Amino acid sequence: MESVTILLAEDETLLLLDFEDALKEAGFMVLAVTSGKKALEHLKAAESSIAGIVTDIRFAESPSGWDVARIAREIDPEMPVVYISGDSAPDWASQGVPKSIMIEKPFVMSQLIVAISQLLNDRRAGVADLE
């Protein structure tokens, strides 16, 4: 099985390391960044290799996680997106991209793995339906 690359954007270093470890233990390759700006740089530079995004909502500087996901969907309309946030969940319906998942902090790592795996599997099922 080929390795799937997830772009992980979280500005709290300890959380970033925890999320990165959990994703790697689940078999994913991880591009970990600490800002929305760095996330966009990776998306634009390596758009074909990123299979999904896990992003915090609020960063110290623009762009926000909402913006990262919207731009990712401009590049790839089916890009799986998991939002992670401590206080932005109420805005998900109005700010989030369609067919995304919101996980509220704090959460157990298995929730993160299940969420991104579900979206990746849904995407693969959609591709298989088209073939």
Regions found by a protein language model. Give the residues of each.
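C-terminal output helix
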Residues: 107-119, 124-129
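Conserved acidic carboxylate
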Residues: 10
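Residues at the ends of beta-strands that form strand-to-helix hinge/output surfaces
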Residues: 103-104
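Conserved phosphotransfer microenvironments
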Residues: 50, 54-70
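Conserved phosphotransfer cores of two-component systems
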Residues: 44-48, 71-78, 95
